UniProtKB/Swiss-Prot annotation:
Residues 457-471 have a biased composition (Gly residues). One of its GO terms (molecular function) is RNA helicase activity. Residues 38-207 form the Helicase ATP-binding domain. CDD domains: DEADc, SF2_C_DEAD. It comes from Synechocystis sp. (strain ATCC 27184 / PCC 6803 / Kazusa). PANTHER family: ATP-DEPENDENT RNA HELICASE DEAD (PTHR47963:SF8), DEAD-BOX ATP-DEPENDENT RNA HELICASE 47, MITOCHONDRIAL (PTHR47963). A motif (DEAD box) lies at residues 155-158. Its EC number is 3.6.4.13. Transmembrane segments: none annotated. One of its GO terms (biological process) is response to cold. Disruption phenotype: Probably a complete knockout; no growth phenotype or large transcript changes at 34 degrees Celsius; at 24 degrees Celsius growth is considerably slower, while expression of a few genes is decreased (groES, groEL1, groEL2 and sll1611) or increased (pyrB, sll1911, sll1515 and rimO) (at 70 umol/photon/m(2)/s, 1% CO(2)). One of its GO terms (cellular component) is cytosol. This is RNA helicase CrhR. It comes from the Bacteria.
């Protein structure tokens, strides 16, 4: 097994040209999966790798492939992915790792013109990245011929299994030469994946990147209890004002919630868009590019759609709706705090969610820090702080000079400080979101009060959330108005 202390890509056997390219695009040191997988793949071994999303697995198979591909040859490599979004990400990454003008990489998936893909195949490509369904379609049309394939990669094989593509994958593998080199990447190892590996891989090397079920330590987790009578959308507004995320994904359960929440956040002045299954392929691609380029800061997404929304340097993840299990929770928040950076995960919890929250915390073997929703004075102080920073920037700008005559004229009648304060007040009022102009105060949330079960006739709907959290005898009730550390007096 490769020495896990290897610190450079050159030590892994990659070419000098490839290593220089990696340095140019900011890749400093290999991850564990890259350290283990790259030498094996360069040596020609088949490989089975168990690795989670976010560990650098794309580079683990793409880099050795790029070092061995012939840019002037026929079709040599086939990479299968469960979704078109992942196919796009893989293809884009491989182009970043190559910069070889003569090398052609083709994406094939549904939602795009198959005629255009056929024309590209006829012109000649060296690498095909695609979903099993579209690959099968092109094979059946006799437009995609696999006789010259030397390398096959199965990316997220367990996801292809769960989406019903495993038979298509087997059909495709049977049409490739038995001498091919095959690499299979899977986060989990169900029986069907093991059977596929035994059938189609030749004495594969096993690489396992262990990832504990606890949350990554670089991610700060916080939860906010939504006050009774408040909606989660209302609770989220002051939280976003205080956090002011550089980039965030807000997870919701349904497409309708995504649409409603996006509309409400847009009305409040946030740079936000929605990402769900109803969007066309072109709409998805456009949104992903805008998000990666920083043109929008917030994306409201469902879990299924968000598989294609992989963005580096994500500062926040917001669980607007809690997921049904701890694994999904970990996967969601694992999108932030990557590559040695810190991140923050926020969860909104209503009384009906408390049993689900307990199950997540029990699985994680940790309690999530409880915070109170920021009150009006805190939000106003934050907005004034931002206004102060904007003012400092404006004082160094060139456009300020055009306003100096007006200031001198006003100074004849008014105090200079009063003029500045009035101008700032005007700017503050104009930029203040509509929800802040209404009378609102954050109700105190009694964390020790049990969550009562209510029937239809009790006016509470079908709230069957159970007993909630109770404090130890003698514990004082917690006051509101600031952040509190995670507390240990909740019943588990």
């Amino acid at each position: 097994m490769t020495n896990t202390l290897t610190s450079t890509f050159a030590d892994l056997g990659l070419s000098e040209k490839r290593c220089q390219l990696l340095a140019d695009i900011g890749f400093e040191a290999p991850t564990q999966i890259q350290t283990e997988a790259i030498p094996l793949l360069l040596s020609g071994r088949d490989m089975l790798a168990q690795s989670q999303t976010g560990t650098g697995k794309t580079a683990a198979f793409a880099l050795p492939l790029m070092d061995r591909i012939d840019p002037e040859g026929d079709l040599q490599a086939l990479i299968l992915t469960p979704t078109r979004e992942l196919a796009q990400q893989v293809a884009e990454a491989m182009k970043d790792f190559s910069h070889e003008r003569r090398l052609f990489i083709l994406n094939v998936y549904g939602g795009q013109s198959i005629e255009r893909q056929i024309r590209s195949l006829e012109r000649g490509v060296q690498i095909v990245v695609g979903t099993p369904g579209r690959v099968i379609d092109l094979i059946d049309r006799k437009k995609l011929k696999l006789e010259t394939i030397q390398w096959v990669v199965l990316d997220e094989a367990d996801e292809m299994l769960s989406m019903g593509f495993i038979d298509d994958v087997k059909t495709i593998l049977r049409k490739t030469p038995p001498t091919r080199q095959t690499a299979c990447f899977s986060a989990t190892m169900p029986r069907e994946i093991k059977e596929l590996v035994n059938q189609f891989l030749n004495d594969p090397a096993l690489v396992t990147v262990k990832q504990t079920q606890s949350t990554p330590t670089r991610i700060e987790q916080q939860l906010y209890h939504v006050p009774r009578g408040w909606s989660k959308a209302k609770a989220l507004q002051p939280i976003l004002e205080m956090e002011d995320p550089e980039s965030a994904i807000i997870f919701v359960r349904t497409k309708q919630t995504a649409a409603d929440l996006t509309s409400r956040l847009q009305e409040a002045g946030h740079s936000v868009d929605e990402y769900h299954g109803n969007l066309s392929q072109s709409q998805r691609e456009r949104l992903v590019h805008r998000f990666r380029d920083g043109k929008i800061k917030l994306v409201v997404a469902t879990d299924i759609a968000a598989r294609g929304l992989d963005v580096n340097n994500l500062s926040h993840v917001v669980n607007f709706d809690l997921p049904d299990n701890a694994e999904t929770y970990i996967h969601r928040i694992g999108r932030t705090g990557r590559a040695g950076k810190t991140g923050k995960a926020i969860a909104l919890v209503e009384p009906i969610d408390r049993r689900l929250l307990r199950s997540i915390e029990n699985r994680l073997k940790q309690q999530i820090e409880v915070c109170t929703i920021p009150n009006r004075s805190q939000v106003e102080a934050k907005r004034i702080e931002k206004l102060q920073e904007q003012l400092k920037e404006a004082l160094t700008g060139e456009r300020m000079a055009s306003f100096l005559p007006l200031v001198r004229e006003l100074s004849d009648e008014y105090d200079a400080q009063a003029i500045a304060a009035a101008a700032l007040q005007m700017i503050y009022d104009q930029s203040c979101p509509h929800w802040m102009k209404s009378d609102w105060e954050v109700p105190e949330v009694d964390f020790n009060k049990p969550v009562l079960r209510r029937g239809r006739n009790a006016g509470g709907g079908q709230n069957k959330s159970g007993g909630g959290y109770q404090g130890k005898p003698g514990k004082p009730r917690r006051s509101s108005g600031g952040r509190r550390p995670a507390y240990s007096d909740r019943q588990q």
